[in-house]
């Protein structure tokens, strides 16, 4: 099996075990009021279903896509009482809405899954990446802290480590925002995940579509590799990270081996491509803007220390930003409002010194002024 497994899949038997005994995950959710941002996304919707199984006091689903919110709303309605959850159509960049939701529902815990994630798309939409991923998280964390919420957990990404894409840099800024705003009253944490198998827009659905149409299957580079987990595994890791009592900071899972994308393509071809009775070729197209050959979960300044549960590691060695961080975030906000890409990139590099912007992004201001 190609998937790099971090632990046993969280299948129905595992969920039965979770529900049958006292455990930190159940304790953290049962009877509690939970706010989930990005609730209609691939990870968010799976997380919503998992949370509902653990019987929260109330679950607030915040999602900016009407279609996605309606889908998760209907899915939960098929198995859960309507008064168990509330669906809120809105954007995490809407601070007035966030304040209203926090004041009205008084959540005990926030799971922050809302994010823009597609690397090449964000390279051509840099203001959206920074506004949503960086500033959206920063403002959410400030409001959560001011409201006295006990904890906030953000789903982060391995692309935040030594980022070369603006998506990765924006998520690293989001991580630093949580480290900066962490307090004894409100625990701020993040968990870095790799690629989730089968998520929309990822290689697996793209490969399956290419195979269905007879190929070729396009891979960026023969040596490019990624870490993969199944959605059930990702959800279980998120719930475990949120349930670590008294812990804050950044967490990473116990890792298996990375998987070559060309091997994923070949496995899917062998599995599904033989049905049409002809060979399906693989072609290499070159790395896309912002893509790496391989991803990392730790920078050279970071060290991973095991947690008590054994499934996760806490990342240490992060330099928590000083008071200038808030000034830089104000600068980022102004840059987004004024659409000043040059200064925005400069500010991102001040916040994330190891960010290496792509040539495409650096050339964008010159193209715009030409």
Question: What is the meaning of each model-derived region?
Answer:
Residues 106, 112, 116-172, 180-181:
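Conserved Rossmann-fold NAD(P)-dependent oxidoreductase catalytic core, especially the SDR/UDP-sugar
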Residues 93, 160, 196-198:
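Conserved sequence/active-site signature of Rossmann-fold short-chain dehydrogenase/reductase
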Residues 76, 104, 126-128, 168-173, ...:
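Short secondary-structure boundary/capping segments
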Residues 56-57, 147-151, 186:
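A short helix->loop->beta-strand "cap" motif at the edges of active sites that frequently abuts
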Residues 1-111, 297, 303:
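N-terminal Rossmann/SDR dinucleotide-binding element
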Residues 96, 134, 138, 235:
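Conserved active-site region of classical short-chain dehydrogenase/reductase
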Residues 5-9, 24-28, 175-196, 200-370:
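Strand-loop microenvironment adjacent to phosphate/nucleotide-handling motifs in alpha/beta enzyme folds
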Residues 87, 129, 152, 188-191, ...:
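Hydrophobic/aromatic anchor residues within beta-strands of the central parallel beta-sheet
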């Amino acid at each position: 099996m190609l998937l790099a497994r971090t632990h046993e899949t969280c299948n129905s038997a595992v969920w039965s075990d979770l529900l049958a005994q006292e455990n930190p995950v159940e304790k953290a959710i049962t009877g509690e009021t939970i706010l989930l941002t990005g609730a209609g996304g691939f990870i968010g919707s799976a997380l919503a279903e998992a949370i509902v199984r653990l019987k929260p006091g109330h679950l607030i689903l915040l999602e900016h896509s009407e279609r996605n919110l309606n889908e998760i709303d209907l899915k939960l309605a098929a198995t859960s009482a309507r008064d168990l959850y509330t669906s809120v159509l809105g954007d995490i960049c809407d601070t007035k809405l966030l304040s209203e939701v926090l004041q009205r529902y008084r959540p005990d815990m926030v799971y922050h899954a809302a994010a823009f994630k597609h690397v090449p798309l964000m390279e051509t939409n840099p203001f959206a990446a920074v506004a949503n991923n960086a500033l959206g998280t920063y403002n959410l964390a400030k409001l959560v802290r001011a409201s006295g919420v006990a904890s906030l957990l953000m789903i982060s990404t391995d692309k935040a480590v030594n980022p070369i894409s603006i998506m990765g840099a924006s998520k690293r800024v989001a991580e630093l925002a949580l480290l900066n705003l962490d307090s004894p009253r409100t625990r701020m944490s993040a968990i870095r995940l790799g690629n989730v198998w089968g998520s929309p827009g990822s290689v697996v659905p793209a490969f399956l579509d290419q195979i269905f149409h007879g190929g070729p299957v396009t891979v960026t580079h023969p040596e490019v590799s990624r870490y993969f987990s199944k959605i059930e595994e990702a959800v279980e890791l998120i719930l475990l990270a949120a349930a670590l009592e008294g812990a804050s900071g950044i967490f990473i899972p116990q890792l298996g081996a990375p998987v070559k994308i060309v091997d994923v393509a070949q496995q899917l071809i062998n599995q599904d491509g033989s049905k049409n009775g002809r060979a399906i070729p693989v072609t290499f197209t070159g790395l896309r803007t912002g893509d790496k050959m391989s991803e990392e979960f730790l920078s050279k300044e970071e060290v991973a220390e095991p947690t008590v549960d054994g499934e996760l590691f806490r990342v240490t060695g992060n330099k928590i930003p000083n008071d200038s961080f808030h000034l830089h975030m104000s600068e980022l906000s102004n840059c987004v409002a004024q659409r000043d890409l040059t200064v925005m990139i400069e500010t991102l590099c001040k916040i994330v010194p190891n960010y290496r912007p792509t040539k495409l992004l650096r050339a964008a201001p010159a193209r715009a002024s030409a």
